[in-house]
């Protein structure tokens, strides 16, 4: 549309936050093997869609994917989704009775991360079971909405030594992590069976920025905000490392938070970094 209707010769995808991995997913689909079914198995043939490839990509304060980010933020102390406030003390980083304290030992981090992944997979198994039940009773197009509690319990929020950066310690982009963990606003807080599989399932979401990035060979600019309270530095590092591009750049915006709310004075510099990069490649 931009090329045909408005006469643009080159198109640059710009993905901020969650838009970064989605931009990678789009470019991967535009140039590679197209999906013919959704993650839930419903027919949706993207090979019939017109998906023009972009000419470059900007990953701006981007995370690696919705599914991976959610998993890294999930509260692993919840073992029963029907009883979300019955929690295992040793895996509840907000419980003062938890004997494991920051800075966390490597063995505890490994145990915690494994429990987060296990919880994501447990929800996925339940989702697939519910979809199978619906289809078995002739309700192929029916849906079920559900709530996912405890989605702001990343060890990074309780331990500044995890993925260290310039971020304000013991907080997150939604405020106090312990409150945001169960508040009405959060990743995947309100979702559906199909939405879970497409967006939030660690094993089933096709929009996996790190996998998609390996097949993206466009010129790419990765911007990391060093005080980001959502997408910490390892997100930018992982995306940069995964990109298949021979022309790729990584730039740190020192002191910048996720939305530049605290440091509006840094926004002009970030814009200048992007525009200089684009000009150097004849995109402006």
What residue ranges belong to the model's regions?
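Short glycine-rich catalytic loops that host catalytic nucleophiles or stabilize transition states
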Residues: 250-256
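Catalytic histidine-centered segment of alpha/beta-hydrolase-like enzymes
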Residues: 256-269
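Short beta-strand/loop motif that positions the catalytic acidic residue
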Residues: 216, 222-224, 228
């Amino acid at each position: 549309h931009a090329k045909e209707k408005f006469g643009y010769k080159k198109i640059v995808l710009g993905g901020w936050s969650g838009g970064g991995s989605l931009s990678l997913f789009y470019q991967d689909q535009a140039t590679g093997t197209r999906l013919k079914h959704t993650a839930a198995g419903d027919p949706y043939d993207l090979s019939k869609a017109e998906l023009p490839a972009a000419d470059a990509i900007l990953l701006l304060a981007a995370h690696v994917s919705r599914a991976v980010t959610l998993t890294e933020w999930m509260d692993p102390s919840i073992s029963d989704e029907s009883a979300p406030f019955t929690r295992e003390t040793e895996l509840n980083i907000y419980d003062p009775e938890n004997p494991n304290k920051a800075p966390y030992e490597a063995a505890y981090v490994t145990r915690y991360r494994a429990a987060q992944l296990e919880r994501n997979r447990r929800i996925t198994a339940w989702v697939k079971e519910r979809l199978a039940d619906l289809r078995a009773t002739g309700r192929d197009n029916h849906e079920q909405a559900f709530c996912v509690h405890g989605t702001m319990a990343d060890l990074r929020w309780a331990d500044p030594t995890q993925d260290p950066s310039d971020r304000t310690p013991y907080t997150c982009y939604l405020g106090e992590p312990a409150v945001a963990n169960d508040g009405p606003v959060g990743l995947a807080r309100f979702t559906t069976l199909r939405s879970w599989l497409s967006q939030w399932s660690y094993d089933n979401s096709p929009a996996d920025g790190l996998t998609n990035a390996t097949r993206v060979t466009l010129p790419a600019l990765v911007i990391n905000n060093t005080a980001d309270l959502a997408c910490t530095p390892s997100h930018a590092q992982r995306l940069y490392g995964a990109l298949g591009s021979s022309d790729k750049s990584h730039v740190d915006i020192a002191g910048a938070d996720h939305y530049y709310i605290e440091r509006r004075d840094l926004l002009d510099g970030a814009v200048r970094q992007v525009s200089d990069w684009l000009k150097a490649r004849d995109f402006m």
